[in-house]
C-alpha cells in the first residue's frame, strides 16, 4: 500500500556554508580552521565547492522547479565576524540578506543554521568550544543574527554537536585532529550545549519572531548479540557518547544518572574529568522546554560488541568498502559483518534505525514538540551519463523511499514529524571525502559549475506534488 505524508510536510534540500559556498576568502570572509587543515592534510579544498556564493539563484530556481519548498542554509560565522567577534563584515551581511530574499522569491523557506562545523580560525586556535570564551562569542554572534535577519523564521543553533566533538577529539578527522581524548569529547559536547541553551533563551526572551531548535546527528546503536550483556553495554555506552548525552542536555536540562554513570565509566578507563558548573545546569534547565523543534540527521545505525582492548579507529575516506575499523577502550567495537546493506564508505543502510530513533525521542523526551529530519541521503560515486546529461541514481531513490516510509510509520504511530530535508540539495564538498562522494538531487560539474537534475530530482518532484511515497 502506498504511504502518504501530510499536506503541510516540508520537502526540503540541505546545504551548508563551507560545503557549498566556495568563496572562502572573498569579500572579507575570515579564515576557518578547515582552510588550514585541508591545505596541510588533504588533496582537496573547499574552493570553489558548489560556488553557491555566486550561483544560489540557479539552485533556488531549480528548487522551486522541482518542488523543494524548504532549504537548510548555514551562515558562515566568519563571513559576519571575520575573527568571530568584534568588527562586522558588511559584505557578508549583505550576501545573506540577498540569499534569504531569493529564497522567499522562489517560495523556498530557509531553515538557517548558525554554526555548521566552521568556527572562525581565530577562536578555533584558542581552543574552540573547549574555551568558554567561545560560548560568549557565539551567543553574541547569534544575537546579532537574530536582530539583523528578521526575514528568517526558522533558526538552528548548531548542526551536529556530537560529530563535532567526535571528529575533533575522538576520530581525529576534523581540525585539530586529536584522537581518543574522551575528556575533550564530552567537554566539547557540554560547552556547545550550554551555548545552544543560552542562545535559545536569548531568542525567546528577546521576543524574536519565528522558531528555534537544534540539529543532532542521531545514529542508532544496537547490540550485535542482544543476549550478550557485554554487547548490550557496549551499545548503551556508544549511545551515551553520540546521542543520550546531548539529548539529555537538550530536553532534560541535566544528565540522567544512567548517562553520567556511563560517562564516568568511560573517563575512568581512559582518563580525564568533566567540568560542569551549577550555573551550567541552571542554563540548560532554563532552556529545556524552549526548543520549538528538533532536527534529526540520520544516515546509519551501528552494531556494537563488547571489547577490552585499546582504542583504534580507521576511517574509510576512500569509498573502498571494508576499510573501516572502530574500537574504543572501555566502550566497545563496531561490528561491520552484519546482514545489512552498506555504502562504499561502510555506512550501514538501516531505515528501521530512523524509526527507532524517532520513537525513542518521542518516548524519552516528550517535550520535543516537533521533529524535522534535517539530513538523510545516500553518498554515492555517481556516474554522469553525458549523452543524457543526468545520473540514473536509482539506489538513492530507493534509499530515500525506504526512509520516508518509516517516517510515515512514525507519524502514524504518534510522532510529530513536520518535514524532510534530503542531504544534499545539489552535490557539495564533503569534509573528509572531497568531491567524489556525491549526495545531491542536482549533479554539479565541479569544473564548469553547471547543474544537471538527476533521476532522483524528478522522483522527488513527484513526491512533493502528490505526497505519495512511490
Swiss-Prot record:
Coiled coil spans: none
Q: Which residues bind D-galactose 6-phosphate?
A: 19, 116, 159-160, 297, 430-431, 437, 439
Query: Which Enzyme Commission number(s) are on file for it?
Result: 3.2.1.85
Q: What class of enzyme is it?
A: hydrolase
Pathway it acts in? Carbohydrate metabolism; lactose degradation; D-galactose 6-phosphate and beta-D-glucose from lactose 6-phosphate: step 1/1
Q: Write out the catalysed reaction.
A: a 6-phospho-beta-D-galactoside + H2O = D-galactose 6-phosphate + an alcohol
A GO BP entry is: lactose catabolic process via tagatose-6-phosphate
What's an example of a GO molecular-function annotation for this chain? 6-phospho-beta-galactosidase activity
Q: What UniProt keywords are attached to this protein's entry?
A: Glycosidase, Hydrolase
At the top level, the lineage of the source is Bacteria
* PROSITE patterns registered for this protein in UniProt: GLYCOSYL_HYDROL_F1_1, GLYCOSYL_HYDROL_F1_2
May I have one GO cellular component term? Answer: cytosol
One Pfam family, short name please?
Glyco_hydro_1
Among InterPro entries, the record links this protein to: 6P-beta-galactosidase, Glyco_hydro_1, Glyco_hydro_1_AS, Glyco_hydro_1_N_CS, Glycoside_hydrolase_SF
What are the positions of the active site?
160, 375
Task: Fetch the SUPFAM superfamilies from UniProt.
Answer: (Trans)glycosidases
Q: What is this protein called?
A: 6-phospho-beta-galactosidase
Amino acid at each position: 500500500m502506498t504511504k502518504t505524508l501530510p499536506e503541510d510536510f516540508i520537502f526540503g534540500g540541505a546545504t551548508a556554508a563551507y560545503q557549498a559556498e566556495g568563496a572562502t576568502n572573498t569579500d572579507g570572509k575570515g579564515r576557518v580552521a578547515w582552510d588550514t587543515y585541508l591545505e596541510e592534510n588533504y588533496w582537496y579544498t573547499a574552493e570553489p565547492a558548489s560556488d553557491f556564493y555566486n550561483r544560489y539563484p540557479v539552485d533556488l530556481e531549480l528548487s522551486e522547479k522541482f518542488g523543494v519548498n524548504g532549504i537548510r542554509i548555514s551562515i558562515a560565522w566568519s563571513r559576519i565576524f571575520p575573527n568571530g567577534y568584534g568588527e562586522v563584515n558588511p559584505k557578508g551581511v549583505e550576501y545573506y540578506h540577498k540569499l534569504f530574499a531569493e529564497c522567499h522569491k522562489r517560495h523556498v523557506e530557509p531553515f538557517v543554521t548558525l554554526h555548521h562545523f566552521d568556527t572562525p580560525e581565530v577562536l578555533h586556535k584558542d581552543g574552540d568550544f573547549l574555551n568558554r570564551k567561545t560560548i560568549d562569542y557565539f551567543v553574541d554572534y547569534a544575537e546579532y543574527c537574530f536582530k539583523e535577519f528578521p526575514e528568517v523564521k526558522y533558526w538552528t543553533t548548531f548542526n551536529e554537536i556530537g560529530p563535532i566533538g567526535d571528529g575533533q577529539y575522538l576520530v581525529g578527522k576534523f581540525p585539530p585532529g586529536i584522537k581518543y581524548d574522551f575528556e575533550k569529547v564530552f567537554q566539547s559536547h557540554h560547552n556547545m550545549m550550554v551555548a545552544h541553551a543560552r542562545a535559545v533563551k536569548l531568542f525567546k526572551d528577546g521576543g524574536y519572531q519565528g522558531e528555534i531548535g537544534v540539529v543532532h546527528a542521531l545514529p542508532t546503536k544496537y547490540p550485535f548479540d542482544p543476549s550478550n550483556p557485554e554487547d548490550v553495554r557496549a551499545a548503551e555506552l556508544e549511545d551515551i557518547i553520540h546521542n543520550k548525552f546531548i539529548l539529555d542536555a537538550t530536553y532534560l536540562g541535566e544528565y540522567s544518572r544512567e548517562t553520567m554513570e556511563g560517562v564516568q565509566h568511560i573517563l575512568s578507563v581512559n582518563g580525564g574529568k568533566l567540568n560542569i558548573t551549577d550555573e551550567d545546569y541552571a542554563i540548560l534547565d532554563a532552556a529545556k522546554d524552549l526548543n520549538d523543534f528538533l532536527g534529526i540527521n540520520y544516515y546509519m545505525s551501528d552494531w556494537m560488541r563488547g571489547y577490552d582492548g585499546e582504542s583504534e579507529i580507521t576511517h574509510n575516506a576512500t569509498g573502498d568498502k571494508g576499510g573501516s575499523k572502530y574500537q574504543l577502550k572501555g566502550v566497545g567495537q563496531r561490528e561491520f559483518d552484519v546482514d545489512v546493506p552498506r555504502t562504499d564508505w561502510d555506512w550501514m543502510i538501516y531505515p528501521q534505525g530512523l524509526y527507532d530513533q524517532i520513537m525513542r525521542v518521542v518516548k524519552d523526551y516528550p517535550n520535543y514538540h516537533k521533529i524535522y529530519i534535517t539530513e538523510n541521503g545516500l553518498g554515492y560515486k555517481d556516474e554522469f551519463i553525458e549523452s543524457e546529461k543526468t545520473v540514473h541514481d536509482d539506489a538513492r531513490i530507493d534509499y530515500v523511499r525506504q526512509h520516508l516510509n518509516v517516517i510515515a510509520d512514525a507519524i502514524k504511530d504518534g510522532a510529530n514529524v513536520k518535514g524532510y530535508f534530503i542531504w544534499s540539495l545539489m552535490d557539495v564538498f564533503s569534509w573528509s571525502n572531497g568531491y567524489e562522494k556525491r549526495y545531491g538531487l542536482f549533479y554539479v560539474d565541479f569544473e564548469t559549475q553547471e547543474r544537471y537534475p538527476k533521476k532522483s530530482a524528478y522522483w522527488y518532484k513527484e513526491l512533493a506534488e502528490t505526497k505519495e511515497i512511490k
